[in-house]
């Protein structure tokens, strides 16, 4: 489940002239990388947003995961690409409400499967990293992975039959751990740098670029640079 604000309000801390375009591009790369994990692990990707233009663009561009997977066609060897679908954020009451809504929709659509919530700004995410993290999650209960700073959350997993119970926001990693989620951060550590590198500021964006961003983000950066020139 990937939450995305309306593009006009997304990434308000990212002081970049192409902020809205970058928010869309990063979400596109994130969705595509998730879709390329392999359907034996990721059955479907669900975007929760009230931005119809973003919804249409991301679902259209993420259909062919092979175009956007940065470490090769992972999905082809693991059951193929997962579908990328979008639903409106009907609660429209913030991030955690959107994630709870998305989790309910995902559970109805894909019964018997667990649910994972992930940041939609993981411009440098590799499918293999997400695959490793999801496979590291325990078969029961919940699991959490901290962001690069160690205080936020980039991935929250709930096994089949468990509620997601998202607590995103300030110090969300500690809140998720205190609420019973198993911490995956120590075990995965530096092996999943793209998964842990969310992008909120220009400093974060520079760090993601060092890791290597996806094609949509790369194109958005090139467009912004050309417009600035």
Which residue ranges define each predicted feature?
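N-terminal nucleotide-binding beta1-loop-alpha1 segment
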Residues: 1-13
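A short, N-terminal amphipathic alpha-helix
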Residues: 23-41
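Short beta-strand/loop segment that forms part of the nucleotide-sugar
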Residues: 42-51
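Short phosphate-binding loop-to-helix
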Residues: 57-114, 172-175
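Conserved donor-nucleotide/metal-binding helix-loop-beta segment in metal-dependent transferases, i.e.
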Residues: 125-149
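Short, glycine-/small-residue-rich phosphate/pyrophosphate-handling segment
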Residues: 156-181
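Conserved alpha/beta core of the MobA/IspD/sugar-nucleotide pyrophosphorylase nucleotidyltransferase superfamily
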Residues: 171, 177-229
């Amino acid at each position: 489940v990937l939450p995305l604000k309306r593009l006009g309000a997304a990434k308000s801390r990212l002081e970049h002239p192409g902020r809205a375009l970058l928010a869309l591009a990063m979400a596109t790369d994130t969705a595509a990388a998730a879709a390329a994990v392999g359907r034996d692990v990721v059955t479907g990707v669900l975007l929760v947003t009230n931005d119809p233009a973003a919804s249409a663009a991301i679902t259209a561009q993420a259909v062919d995961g092979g175009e956007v997977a940065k470490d090769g066609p992972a999905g082809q060897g693991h059951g193929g690409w997962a579908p990328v679908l979008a639903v409106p954020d009907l609660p429209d009451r913030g991030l955690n409400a959107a994630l709870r809504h998305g989790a309910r929709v995902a559970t109805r659509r894909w019964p018997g499967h667990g649910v994972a919530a992930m940041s939609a700004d993981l411009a440098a995410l590799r499918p293999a990293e997400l695959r490793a993290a999801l496979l590291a999650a325990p078969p029961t209960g919940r699991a959490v992975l901290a962001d690069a700073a160690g205080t936020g959350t980039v991935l929250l997993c709930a096994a089949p039959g468990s509620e997601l119970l998202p607590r995103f926001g300030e110090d969300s990693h500690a809140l998720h751990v205190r609420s019973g989620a198993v911490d995956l951060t120590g075990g995965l550590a530096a092996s999943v740098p793209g998964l842990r590198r969310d992008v909120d500021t220009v400093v974060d964006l520079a760090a993601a670029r060092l890791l290597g961003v996806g094609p949509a983000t790369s194109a958005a950066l090139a467009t912004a640079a050309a417009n600035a020139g």
